[in-house]
């Protein structure tokens, strides 16, 4: 099943211009517009992947403690989560997320997204729409994303799932108004290198933001959430092969509401609510911040 959607009218771009008439659409968003398609084949590739990072960052382990350490493969280094004091020039880190390839999932137009079932209550309809068996790996992937989108917000969190560019824009404007900017990870070129060194010019962009994690689905779905007392940074990086990048990192100042079995506490050997915990954002994560 691969249902292509005509992009002749460019409705998503027109919506962007209506909201931000004096601002060009960022490249990170333009890349999510073509081809506008629902693609079941992509699900198969995602289901085969053992990568759990996006799921972990989108959920922060707030839900089921039994899922905190998937497949028993718990990272043992501090490069996934780290302390705020480590965010300084010269610090070397292995950033697997920044080096991995982007997914091909793109936004579908808002009318299409709204016509496709998207809830646990309607999960049998979702399976029927994508012609999937209930126990297939692809079905499990869809279910995880829908469950993540429907999980209750924790204390200090506002959350929303966007399945079209229009709803993605709305998620930012509804909280901050139109005087906002969109931040994204920037990589000079594709690289297999995973080791980067933090350069000069680490910049704190504020403590009010909406972090939007790209979830695993047959089209682009972003889990957007704002968590109290969270700072976002832009971090210049240089890879061991010379590749330059600008990455996004967040530091959570208050983790007292997090699940005590969250992976971050296991890696850093600290308890909830004791110290700020930081992590770089996955390559396709987008962040709204006020200007």
Residue ranges and their predicted role:
Residues 116-291:
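Folded, disulfide-stabilized extracellular/luminal domains of secretory-pathway proteins
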Residues 1-167:
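Intrinsic-disorder-preferring feature that marks N-terminal prepro/targeting segments
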């Amino acid at each position: 099943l691969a249902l292509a959607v005509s992009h002749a009218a460019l409705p998503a771009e027109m919506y962007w211009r209506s909201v931000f008439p004096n601002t060009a659409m960022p490249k990170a968003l333009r890349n999510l517009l073509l081809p506008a398609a629902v693609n079941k084949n992509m699900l198969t590739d995602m289901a085969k992947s053992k990568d759990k990072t996006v799921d972990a960052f989108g959920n922060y382990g707030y839900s089921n403690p039994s899922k905190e350490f998937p497949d028993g493969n718990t990272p043992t280094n501090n490069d996934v989560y780290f302390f705020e004091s480590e965010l300084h020039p010269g610090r070397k880190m292995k950033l697997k997320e920044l080096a991995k390839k982007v997914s091909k999932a793109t936004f579908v137009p808002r009318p299409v997204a709204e016509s496709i079932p998207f809830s646990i209550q309607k999960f049998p309809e979702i399976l029927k729409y994508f012609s999937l068996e209930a126990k297939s790996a692809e079905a499990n992937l869809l279910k995880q994303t829908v469950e993540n989108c429907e999980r209750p917000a924790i204390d200090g969190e506002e959350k929303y799932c966007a399945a079209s560019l229009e709803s993605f824009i709305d998620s930012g404007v509804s909280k901050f108004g139109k005087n906002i900017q969109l931040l994204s990870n920037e990589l000079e070129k594709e690289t297999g290198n995973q080791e980067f060194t933090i350069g000069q010019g680490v910049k704190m962009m504020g403590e009010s933001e909406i972090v939007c994690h790209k979830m695993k689905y047959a089209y682009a779905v972003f889990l957007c959430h704002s968590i109290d007392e969270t700072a976002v940074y832009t971090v210049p990086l240089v890879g061991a092969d010379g590749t330059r990048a600008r990455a996004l990192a967040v530091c959570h100042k208050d983790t007292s509401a997090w699940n005590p079995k969250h992976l971050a506490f296991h890696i850093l050997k600290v308890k909830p609510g004791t110290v700020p915990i930081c992590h770089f954002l996955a390559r396709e994560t987008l962040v709204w911040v006020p200007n």
